[in-house]
């Protein structure tokens, strides 16, 4: 379907009119105090905050373009049609190495290649993890990185203006105190819901998932109607480029260069230690170097930050030498500790007449009506995102005996390996989480088809997506070549721990339990994925291996942890062994969380900006 969008209303937003510059030579000639590598979610937050001081000159190097008036980015529901992810115009189009535990399948790994980064192409869910999960970061040796230390910065980034409708319906009062109301990113709730959404919620509760009316409080266990990053006044996606960048673009001390790829952090050994002096980058096939007087801040993301560190001589010396790069700083944790949320999606055909998102795809009349409603009222189906989700513990999906077997199998496998010091500490924490009422599995209702395909013509579906939140499998990212423009080798090592597969198998069974529960069951015809004849554990194991995908939440490849544990950055986000090189993106997250990541990363970036300001 064609998504049209008039942007005349942008004049009403009160935003600045500055735009990125288009000359690499001009950028390189400027003098900067700070250079931010990567104009994604975190990078734009940091650049915006640092440039609040008019005496500080801030440069941003971004590989993508600024898609200011692009309806595929700005219209919330457009992302469901998968026009953005793995589209080379907007996406790096990265992929995993063949996964040996997935029958050598190669898994697509979308990452936003645009000003705003992945906040420009994400599915917009705007939620938080639990207090226990954030507190675990501090348990790993990162003082001040806990729920209490991060919550004020998450709130600083966000602006809620309305109460979640289900919460309001049970008369639980005003906007919760744990939600921010003065920030730039609009947190809001869908005003349009497809027909199966509320019957699904009732079925999930009957299946044993408790309702949660305050999931932002630090306890996110239960079924909830999550917020999305959507501006309900304009009907537009609210993301880093049209908020943080737009609010700061008029500043003469903030300079953003787009379509430029950083190739190396220029490092020198000084009397203070290894010091970042600038950044080399390629812009329209020419190489330039820009200099930074104070700091270089690396915000290239989980998949590309470790590559740039290694290209600059920071990492495992053996990896660097293999590609002819002289080691400048031995830091074996670079590129390690890769963690991701992996999922399988069960799909169910719904009865004729039941409205889901699929009808917009195959029903021209429904598509035209949705577009007309969006154009006239900035409301309706085109503003709706997936929001009905649950975080559940293992006891929802498996009995005590089966969970006990999972534990024993896990420790048998760990005993045969040589886990890193960081992994040993992580596994101790994760093992405790398996026994707690915590979100070990996320259950997402997608009111449409989200299977491996193909869907039947002129047919509507719902999908129940089951996603592991605390995987035990660990992967890595390292150089594939000394060519800085070549992608790195990304090996997530999915299902290298049997427990991850066991959890997904039991999760499929639980999805079926919800689907067979009233009042949802009467709306469904049959299960399509996996096919109804897939019943035994053996068959389910095969299906899981063949159908695993990722929810696109990679973290951990420049982990914040003490160097003795294999960490890459310290609690001030400085790379161990350097004087002024910091990392600010999801790669610093040491352990995964039961949440979608954008809200946490906004908080990390706000906290990082405060740390940097306080150092000068």
Task: Describe each region flagged by the PLM.
Residues 2-616:
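N-terminal redox-cofactor-binding region of secreted/periplasmic oxidoreductases
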């Amino acid at each position: 379907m064609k998504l049209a969008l008039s942007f005349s209303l942008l004049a009403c937003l009160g935003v600045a009119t500055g735009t990125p510059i288009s000359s690499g030579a001009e950028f390189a000639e400027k003098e900067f105090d700070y250079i931010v590598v990567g104009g994604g979610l975190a990078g734009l937050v940091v650049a915006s905050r640092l440039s609040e001081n008019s005496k500080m000159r801030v440069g941003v190097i971004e590989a993508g373009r600024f898609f200011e008036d692009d309806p595929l980015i700005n219209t919330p529901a457009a992302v469901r049609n998968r026009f953005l992810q793995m589209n080379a115009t907007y996406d790096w189009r990265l992929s995993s190495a063949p996964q040996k535990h997935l029958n050598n399948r190669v898994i697509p790994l979308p990452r936003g290649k645009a000003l705003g980064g992945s906040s420009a192409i994400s599915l917009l869910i705007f939620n938080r993890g639990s207090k226990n999960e954030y507190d675990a970061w501090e348990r790993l040796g990162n003082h001040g990185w806990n729920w209490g230390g991060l919550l004020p910065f998450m709130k600083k980034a966000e602006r809620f203006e309305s109460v979640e409708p289900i919460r309001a319906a049970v008369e639980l009062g005003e906007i919760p105190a744990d939600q921010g109301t003065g920030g730039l990113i609009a947190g809001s709730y869908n005003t349009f819901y497809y027909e199966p959404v509320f019957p699904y919620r009732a079925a999930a509760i009957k299946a044993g998932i408790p309702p949660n009316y305050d999931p932002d409080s630090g306890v996110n266990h239960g079924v909830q109607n999550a917020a999305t990053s959507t501006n309900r006044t304009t009907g537009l996606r609210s993301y880093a480029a049209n908020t943080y960048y737009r609010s700061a673009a008029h500043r003469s001390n903030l300079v953003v260069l787009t379509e430029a790829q950083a190739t190396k952090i220029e490092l020198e050994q000084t009397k203070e230690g290894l010091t970042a002096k600038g950044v080399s980058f390629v812009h329209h096939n020419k190489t330039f170097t820009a200099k930074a007087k104070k700091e270089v801040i690396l915000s290239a993301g989980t998949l590309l930050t470790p590559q740039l560190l290694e290209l600059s001589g920071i990492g495992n010396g053996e990896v660097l030498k293999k590609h002819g790069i002289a080691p400048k700083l031995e830091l074996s944790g670079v590129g390690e500790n890769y963690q991701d949320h992996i999922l399988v999606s069960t799909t169910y055909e719904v009865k004729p007449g039941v409205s889901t998102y699929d009808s917009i795809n195959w029903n021209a009349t429904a598509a035209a009506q949705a577009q007309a409603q969006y154009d006239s009222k900035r409301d309706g189906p085109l503003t709706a995102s997936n929001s009905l989700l649950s975080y559940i513990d293992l006891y929802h999906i498996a009995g005590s005996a089966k969970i006990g077997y999972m534990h024993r199998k896990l420790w048998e496998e760990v005993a045969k390996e040589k886990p890193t010091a960081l992994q040993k500490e992580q596994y101790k924490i994760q093992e405790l989480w398996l026994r707690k009422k915590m979100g070990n599995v996320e259950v997402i209702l997608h009111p449409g088809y989200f299977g491996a395909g193909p869907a039947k013509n002129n047919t509507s579906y719902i999908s129940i997506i089951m996603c592991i939140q605390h995987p035990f499998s660990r992967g890595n990212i390292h150089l594939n070549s000394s060519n800085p423009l070549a992608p790195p080798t990304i090996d997530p090592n999915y299902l290298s721990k049997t427990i991850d597969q066991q959890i997904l198998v039991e999760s499929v069974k639980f999805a079926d339990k919800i689907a067979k529960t009233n009042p949802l069951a009467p709306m469904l015809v049959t299960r399509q994925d996996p096919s109804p004849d897939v019943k035994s554990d053996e068959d389910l194991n095969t299906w899981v291996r063949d159908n695993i995908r990722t929810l696109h939440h990679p973290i951990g490849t420049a982990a914040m942890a003490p160097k003795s544990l294999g960490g890459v950055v310290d609690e001030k986000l400085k790379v161990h062994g350097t004087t002024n090189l910091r990392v600010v993106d999801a790669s610093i997250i040491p352990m995964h969380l039961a949440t979608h990541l954008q809200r946490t990363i906004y908080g990390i970036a706000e906290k990082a900006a405060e740390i940097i300001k306080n150092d000068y």
